[in-house]
Amino acid sequence: MTQERKFVTVNPLFARPGENTVAAKYELSDEQMLPETAYQIVHDETMLDGNARLNLATFVGTWMDDHANRLYAESYDKNMIDKDEYPQTAAIEENCWRILAKLWHAPDPASTIGTSTIGSSEACMLGGLALKRRWQQARRAAGKSTDRPNMVMSSAVQVCWEKFCNYWDIEARYVPITEEHKTFDGHDLDSYVDENTIGVVAIMGVTYTGMYEPVKQIADALDAIQAKTGLDIAIHIDAASGGMIAPFLQPDLVWDFQLERVHSISTSGHKYGLVYPGLGWVIWRSADLLPEELIFKVSYLGGEMPTFALNFSRPAAQVLLQYYLFLRLGRDGYTQVQQAAQDVAKYLSAGIAKLGPFELWNDGSDIPVFAWKLKDSASKNWTLYHLSDRLRTEGWLVPAYPMPADLPDITVQRIVVRNGFSMDLADKFLTDLAKQTTYLDQLDSPMPIEGQPAFHH
């Protein structure tokens, strides 16, 4: 008589016969696995990741409320590209970009055009493509060559602009960032632009430091260039972070469609738009600034759908989350949330400035992001890379990195304060920072410089 062996549910799950093995990583296993075990393997491996709430390196949102999480769970299976299949979701997408058009002072929000994207990098590339195509149209109409287009931008641009210029054969002309000119401010701009310039990029919230580039000052410089040379050069605003900060914390700042030279603005819904990744937005001042030839009308699932995107299928849930927040927070709520983040940023920067070896690069007065460097008088036994490494032992992820190419000898650390980072956590961070700084200052000899930690964004 065969004795049937019975198994009980045990914890850990891997005590069951056949499961006390190393999971296949680079190929499909021949056999199935119980869902509980597969879940536990993935769950356990991701415990080795950093804590998202203590990640002060990322701009990406890491917290939403329970209602948003419920809405997310209800809509994760919707594809944003299926506008014929999900018409109300498509209508909500349009509601969102029209809200942004009005927020950014489009002269006539009813006649503008925009779209959601997978993130602000795609949004930037779409804005850049429109600039290139309009430049090509104007050159051809004038009987001129369309060879050798260029784009002018700060040396501190986010890497998506380097990709854009590389992928679409555009010469990137970088205006240096220096200690005298901490941002691209329009100085010496006439030596960078010419008849082949498709546009100028201005950044509302530089990735390295969080500082705003003075858009009006850049626009004024381009006005002067046009008066002198006749060159009419447009601006794209990369407002990945600042586009959802400036309207609420600096409402009197002139940076958006109030300036005629601004043709398009992009932002990130998953940064200070407060949505989970990935979501971006790009809006044009008026519909005629987006060349019709770039818009595809695709027959898909029984309907004709206009689309302008680099991606095709992408989640619709984040668009619905953005609309939820627009309804939930309104101007007053967004102002409160962003002000709370900036209050924490200024509290942190003030506390760091009081610690002996540090000198602030900026204090978080633009977006809630700031950077600092070591004073010349600081100990030579350690660097900010070592401090970043020490802070990891406390659970904090704080990047250290060199400034752009024109400031190669300056290393900074940067903190991004996001929604959900409380004043209490900030106080705990300052305590840990002081503790690790004291530890490093007490070293009798220099720390090794090989294998310094790095963050890649």
Q: Where do the protein language model's features map onto the residues?
A:
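Active-site C-terminal subdomain of aminotransferase-like
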Residues: 231, 244, 248-251, 255-368, ...
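Short amphipathic alpha-helices in soluble, non-transmembrane regions
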Residues: 383-392, 429-434
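Conserved PLP-enzyme active-site core in the AAT-like
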Residues: 4, 11, 118-296, 301-303
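PLP-dependent enzyme catalytic core of the Aspartate aminotransferase-like
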Residues: 225, 407-457
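N-terminal entrance/gating region of PLP-dependent enzymes' catalytic architecture
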Residues: 1-111, 395-396, 413, 433, ...
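A common structural junction motif
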Residues: 391-399, 434-441
